[in-house]
Amino acid sequence: MAKKSSIEKNNRRRRMNRNAAAKRARLKAIIGDKTKPMEERFAATLKLAEMPRNSSATRIRNRCELTGRPRSNYRKNKLSRIALRDLGSRGLVPGLVKSSW
């Protein structure tokens, strides 16, 4: 089980990203638009740099929904390999069958 503080920190980053995503996208569009004047693009770069780091999508870590484990997660299930195996062996994951050949 991961520390509650690290799980909460990641949730806070997700919230910040959700709130600032539109503004970040607008600024990035201005920065990438070569038809805009250089001064306007530079001003957009400065505004983007002033935004909180935690509002960036790259700061978000995929974590297991049950345990909070940060490594070896399956995106589709939002579970770590350990939690997925445990739930799968109990028959709680639809369509998941134990491999045998």
UniProtKB/Swiss-Prot annotation:
The cross-references to Pfam families, in alphabetical order and at most eight, read: Ribosomal_S14 (PF00253)
Which portions of the chain have biased composition (kind: Basic residues)?
11-23
GO BP: translation
Gene3D superfamilies, per this entry?
A: 1.10.287.1480
- GO MF: rRNA binding; structural constituent of ribosome
Database matches in SUPFAM superfamilies: Glucocorticoid receptor-like (DNA-binding domain)
Task: Report residue spans for region: Disordered.
Answer: 1-23
What domain of life is recorded for the organism? Bacteria
Q: Where are the transmembrane segments?
A: none
The record's listing under InterPro entries reads: Ribosomal_uS14, Ribosomal_uS14_bac/plastid
Keywords annotated in UniProt: Ribonucleoprotein, Ribosomal protein, RNA-binding, rRNA-binding
**GO cellular component: a single term:** cytoplasm
Q: Where is the composition biased (Basic and acidic residues)?
A: 1-10
Q: What does this protein do?
A: Binds 16S rRNA, required for the assembly of 30S particles and may also be responsible for determining the conformation of the 16S rRNA at the A site.
To which protein family does this belong? Belongs to the universal ribosomal protein uS14 family.
| Quaternary structure and partners | Part of the 30S ribosomal subunit. Contacts proteins S3 and S10.
Q: What is this protein called?
A: Small ribosomal subunit protein uS14
Q: What is the lineage of its organism?
A: Bacteria, Pseudomonadati, Pseudomonadota, Alphaproteobacteria, Hyphomicrobiales
